[in-house]
């Protein structure tokens, strides 16, 4: 079967416009990496925000990374922490590590070694105590 990226993109857009968070998450990647479309971080952020607001943990983590680096949005460490926390609370290990790093570095939150360790332990599957 031959892949038809244009057809797939059409259907992802249709599903994304109808509010499908998984399709919106995929569209975020498509636009971030320019897979069959012009690469556009602003458009990636738009799709990830749509999915993140519906509770999609992967999109929340991706949106956090965009805020952390200032790609497609104004750099905002506080917003990065907010979105990583949402993903981390759903068990996303990468988000837990990144949230721990933010506490370690005091970026977007007050520096707090104990809070950083709590998130690192969660990411490692250990007790958060």
Residue ranges and their predicted role:
Residues 4, 12, 17-20, 33-35, ...:
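Short helix-capping/linker turns of helical repeat alpha-solenoids
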């Amino acid at each position: 079967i031959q892949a038809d990226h244009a057809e797939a993109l059409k259907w992802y857009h249709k599903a994304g416009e109808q509010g499908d968070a998984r399709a919106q998450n995929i569209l975020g990647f498509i636009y971030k990496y320019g897979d069959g479309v012009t690469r556009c971080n602003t458009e990636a952020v738009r799709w990830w925000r749509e999915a993140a607001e519906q509770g999609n943990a992967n999109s929340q983590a991706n949106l956090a990374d965009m805020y952390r680096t200032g790609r497609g949005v104004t750099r905002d460490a506080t917003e990065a922490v907010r979105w990583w926390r949402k993903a981390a609370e759903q068990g996303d290990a990468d988000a837990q590590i990144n949230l721990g790093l933010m506490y370690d570095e005091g970026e977007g939150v007050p520096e707090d070694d104990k809070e950083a360790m709590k998130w690192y332990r969660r990411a490692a599957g250990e007790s958060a105590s």
